Regions:
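N-terminal activation segment of mature serine protease catalytic domains
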Residues: 1-53, 60, 64, 240-254
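Catalytic-histidine neighborhood of serine endopeptidases
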Residues: 49, 56-57, 63-107, 116-117
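Short, surface-exposed secondary-structure boundary micro-motifs
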Residues: 65, 153-154, 219-220
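Active-site region of chymotrypsin-like
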Residues: 29-45, 115-136, 160-248
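Active-site substrate-binding loop(s) of clan PA
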Residues: 70-76, 98-103, 117-158, 243
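Beta-strand/loop subdomains of soluble extracytoplasmic proteins
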Residues: 79-99, 143-149, 160-176, 235
Length: 255
């Protein structure tokens, strides 16, 4: 009887997590999500845009394809060779960020480091204004049927947009083939298939469970199927972050 009661309590706990208040979860995660803009600094024109989210107070995850026009793949950037992008935080501040680490095109992940400078909207000049932001926690506990929320900047114009859906399938690399001319776009990582809308500009944003934890990185949606969208699973992101830490710790200290 006691075992049955514990099992029931666990089921109720899981049910409450799955049916959590949607607006509360969104309010919890929005401060950790940013819009990412790749700029031509000579002309001031936007090259591309996407989304990202904080995994530590000053480190942002996004997709590599969001920044591929200015950054090499599978690369650790030294301090004197970084490429800069513009990120817009939840409070509307335009903040400078640096590309510090990229995966290969198949991993499709990249890390940005925010600087202590924002763009003054009145003058367009950089102004020192250091700040830290709340990071999101990763979760590897995901099942088909789980409710999820995709957060991002669709079309590069609608920041902090949220859509909801479920995990439709969990696919290992050998179980799917997506891309032009039958060429895999992501061939090395586990992905989550969801019916939560992922539009251009959503790339790099978080796919969130009802506990406000990241279960995936929104990556792309199929053009001919509105309800088939793919996110890189958080376990692949965790491996990528571990690779960054290993590379960073292996760098020699400056004299």
């Amino acid at each position: 009887m006691q075992a049955d009661r514990k099992a029931l309590q666990q089921q109720l706990k899981e049910f409450k997590t799955q049916t959590g208040n949607f607006s509360d979860v969104v309010e919890q995660v929005l401060p950790s999500v940013v819009s990412v803009y790749v700029m031509d600094w000579d002309t001031g024109e936007e090259i591309s845009s996407g989304s990202g989210f904080f995994v530590s107070p000053d480190v942002i995850v996004t997709n590599y394809h969001v920044i591929e026009d200015i950054a090499d793949e599978d690369y650790f950037y030294e301090e004197d060779e970084v490429e800069q992008v513009l990120v817009e935080t939840y409070d509307g501040k335009l903040r400078m960020a640096e590309v510090v680490f990229t995966g290969n095109a198949e991993e499709d992940l990249a890390l940005l480091l925010i600087t202590g400078f924002i763009i003054d909207p009145a003058t367009g000049e950089q102004v020192e204004s250091p700040e830290e932001y709340p990071p999101l926690e990763l979760s590897f506990d995901v099942k088909v049927g789980d409710r999820v929320i995709a957060v991002g900047n669709p079309m590069g114009q609608f920041a902090a947009t949220v859509t909801q859906g479920i995990i439709s399938a969990i696919r290992e690399p050998e179980e799917y083939e997506v891309g032009e001319d039958d060429e895999d776009e992501i061939a090395e990582v586990k992905v989550l298939q969801t019916d939560a809308a992922i539009n251009p500009g959503n790339s790099g944003g978080p796919l969130i469970n009802m506990a406000g934890q990241v279960v995936g990185v929104n990556t792309w949606g199929l053009e001919d199927a509105d309800t088939i969208n793919l996110a890189i699973a958080s376990v692949a992101l965790d491996d990528f972050l571990a690779g960054f830490e290993e590379t960073f710790e292996g760098e020699p200290d400056e004299e």
